[in-house]
Amino acid sequence: MRIVKLKRSFYNRPTLEVAVDLLGKILIYIFNGEKLGGRLVELEAYIGQDDPACHAFKGKTSRNEIMYGKAGFLYVYFTYGNHHMLNIVTERAGFPAAVLIRGMEPIYGIETMMKNRGVEKITDISNGPGKLAKALGITTKQKGLDVTGNIITVVDDKKQSDDICCSSRIGIGDNGADKLWRFYIKDNPHVSKTSRKVNNTAKLF
């Protein structure tokens, strides 16, 4: 079956649509000449200056300015003094929004990703955003990479996603906790957490 690389137009759409449509797609990153990556199974949407959980809530800064640029570029930031978070910018230029990649089912370069993470179980490789970035070897040095390029990309192998669930986002406290903007594939072992009130995405659109 033909594998199709996602174009910039895929990301230049409403963030909730992009987040849901990214589930089941395959993220590929070239790390030291080796192909690493896997199937995306968990994502969160962060949308504009009206979203209190979004980095752009208080306006444009040197840290978040890439969110105001064109869709389809990496926004990577360092948090909690230990973790890098991997996001893909969405929507039109000038409107700050992004999708946080929270969980990935490993496919390519599994041994290297285990080594990067220092783990032995495949389900411990990328079941969380910080774990995922570390497994891939992605840091703030990769901030600004074009996701439609050759170093990092997302492809569609036309496989249907399993049941999709949505919930409130993780680790944001009360900031936007009413928004069910976390999307994940039901019962997938590479999802970070499932102990949250869930809903069906059909009720959102």
Locate predicted features:
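Conserved, well-structured core segments that form or line functional sites
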Residues: M1-F205
